[in-house]
């Protein structure tokens, strides 16, 4: 749904099989699936979604994304091969995730280092999510991964050797 309105407006899309659709399709109200919310059919959200779908078709966005997915996969592989403190590197389409391999929760500190370099990531604990917009270029994705590498190195440089399970906190400059 975020691809339809960039997450700014409530909009979703449901895809199903014809058998499931037919189970709910009827003129009798009691047979219908009457679940919705107060944003149902919002004209602004529908207009934004239709415009997005037109752009997807006109600009062949899904084909373009295939090349971006490959660039992201290459960047993730380089991070994984760089002997940096990350683990559980994974990717599905244009969403990539890796986990910071520290006993302390440093996701927010890492996010702040990246933000200082102009890259916004989404940390959830020590899990770092990369969700670039579809209009990102391959060069920009390469730049993002360069910054991630730099910030991981910087994070390592400022982390004292703290035993696992220690309650000592870490302050980054």
Where are the model-predicted features located?
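Conserved N-terminal phosphate-binding loop of PLP-dependent enzymes in the Aspartate aminotransferase
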Residues: 1-173
